[in-house]
Design a protein with these regions (language model features):
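FAD-binding subdomain of flavoenzyme oxidoreductases
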Residues: 1-108
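Short acidic/histidine-rich active-site segments
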Residues: 230, 270-279
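General alpha-helical segment detector with a strong preference for membrane-spanning helices
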Residues: 62, 69, 207, 278-279
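Short beta-alpha connecting loops at secondary-structure transitions
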Residues: 245, 279-280
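Short conserved micro-motifs on helix faces and helix-strand junctions that flank
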Residues: 5, 55, 200, 272-273
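C-terminal substrate-recognition/cap domain of FAD-linked oxidoreductases
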Residues: 72, 81-86, 91-259, 263, ...
């Protein structure tokens, strides 16, 4: 995870690997072992070697040890699902939640196609195959309630449904199952199929434009485009199923990804938000 500068669904609140790692032990190509960073809150001692090695994908050295910053376990954790009539409504809501400065722990998006795939694969009930946002709030009960009011109001303004809530761990896991099963549900669409995932990341102010562009281009290229997004940090994945024996299908997917990458760069984004570039 450190080598690719990975992150997860809670990066919007707790940060990426660059945020949570305070120091590394690294073996350099010549065999030397170095330690970067430390346990202090701050330092002005030269170059930030820790951040240089994070995301370098093994090209500068092999990371053998990491020092992590820990966060306290929140007093209260609350999860919710909200459905929307269009993908644009859902993405716009997420964009506004971040722009309002709501300290949300997770805000994940699944488009209509992905919701349908997940529901069928995981035999889920009480959720709909429509564009959906998954929210999670961490904090004290009172602060969570205040933040929930804001998010519910923003969702309502964008034609969102009433929230479906989960408080205890078992309920939360059921609620999030559609999200956790994304990869396997898409892989199961094709016998012996594979999955190609895009990983562009754009500024929050451009996330609606980029997601809309991805949907338009998927239609243009004739590819099926289930979608999942970490809306809190502008990162989303088009999760494309393909048959490895079908060369033409794979070419189409690569061409679609190239087009999406160019759009992300045009919007001052990046080609990869968390997966890395796959250096060998």
């Amino acid at each position: 995870m450190a080598s690719t500068s990975a992150s997860g669904t809670m990066a919007v609140k707790y940060g990426t690997m660059k945020t949570v790692i305070s120091g590394l032990t690294v073996v350099l190509p010549n065999g030397d072992i170095i330690n970067t960073g430390g346990r202090t809150k701050k330092t002005s001692a030269g170059y930030n070697l820790t951040n240089l090695f994070i995301g370098s994908e093994g090209t500068l050295g092999i990371i053998t040890e990491v020092h992590l910053r820990l966060s306290p376990i929140p007093e209260s954790i609350m999860s919710a699902v909200c459905h929307f009539p269009t993908l644009e409504d859902a993405v716009q809501t997420a964009q506004q939640v971040i722009q309002y400065g709501v300290p949300i722990a997770r805000i994940e998006m699944l488009n209509k196609d992905q919701m349908g795939i997940s529901i069928n694969y995981s035999k889920l009930k009480d959720i709909q195959a429509v564009p959906t946002l998954f929210f999670e709030f961490h904090g004290s009960e009172s602060s969570n309630n205040e933040n929930i009011k804001i998010v519910e109001e923003l969702s309502k303004d964008n034609r969102g449904s009433s929230f479906k809530w989960a408080k205890d761990l078992e309920e939360r896991n059921k609620l999030w199952k559609a999200r956790w099963d994304v990869y396997y549900s898409v892989k199961a669409l094709i016998n012996n199929g594979r999955v190609y995932s895009t990983d562009v990341c754009v500024p929050i102010s451009k996330i609606t434009e980029c997601v809309n562009f991805a949907e338009e281009q998927a239609k243009k290229f004739g590819v099926r485009a289930p979608m999942v997004g970490h809306m809190g940090d502008g990162n989303f994945h088009v999760v494309l199923p393909f048959d490895p024996e079908n060369k033409e299908s794979y070419k189409k997917i690569r061409a679609f990804n190239d087009t999406l990458i160019r759009k992300a760069l045009e919007l001052n984004g990046t080609i990869t938000g968390e997966h890395g570039v796959g250096l060998h």
